[in-house]
Amino acid sequence: MLSARSLFQEIHDDDQAFRLFCSIAAKGEDQGGWENGRIARLVPDPVLAPKVARHGADEDKHGRIFKALMHKRGLTERDVPDDTDYTMILERQGIGLAHARLRRDEPLTEQDVITYLAHSRVTEQRASEQMLMLKRIFGDHPELGRAVRMISNDEDNHLAFCHEELLRLAYHGHGRAILDTLQATARAEIRTYRDVSLAVMAHLGELLRWPRAKSAALAAGIHAVYAYERAGGWRRMTTLKMPARLNALGGPAPHEQFA
C-alpha cells in the first residue's frame, strides 16, 4: 500500500535516492539563503533588514544540515536536474525578486518588499506543510529526527514572520497590492509544485526501479493534489492572520547545534 511514510522510508533506505532528495533540498535552501542575504542588504528598513538576514541564516543552516545528513552516510552532493529546481522555475515565471535585481546594489522599493514577502508567504506555507509531514514520519528517527524537528520549527518561524510583516504593510495601505501579489504567486506556485513533484518522482522512480503501476499511482496522486489546490486549496496560501509567534525572527539565530 502506498503511503507518504512508506515512500519516504524507501527513499531514506536507498543511498542514491536519499542523495538526490537531500541534494535537491540543499540546493533550494542554499538559493534561499543567498536571496535573503541579498535582500537583507538592500532593504532600507533597519527593523526589517535583520529579520530578513536571520531568515537567510536559517536557510543556509538548513542547506548545511541536508549536506551533513549525506556526509554521515558517506555521500556527496550531486547535480540537481533542472526540472526539479523549484526556486529557479518560479523565478523564470517572474515570481519573487529576480536574481538580476538582487545583484544590483540598489535599495528595494516598497513594492519589491511586498513581492519578497508575498513570495515567502506562499513558499513558506509549502515548506512548513512539507516539514510537518516529515516530522510526523521521522520526528523520532535516530538519524533524521533532530534535523527534521529543527528545520520544521524554523519554517514555522519563517511563515509567522511573513504573516506579521504583510499585515503590518496592509495596515499602512498596501492591502490590495499584497492580495494581488499573493494570488498571482499562489497560482504559479501550485503549478510549479505539481511539475516539480512529477519530475522528482520520475527521477526517484528511475533510481528505485519502480514498476509503471507504482509510478502511475504516484503521478495520479500529484495530479489529484493539484486539482484540489486549483479548485480552491490555493487560497490557504493567500490568507493572513496575526501569528501566535510574534517577532519570530527577532534577535540572532539560536546557536547551531546540528551542522
Which role does the model predict for each range below?
Residues 1-259:
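Non-heme di-metal
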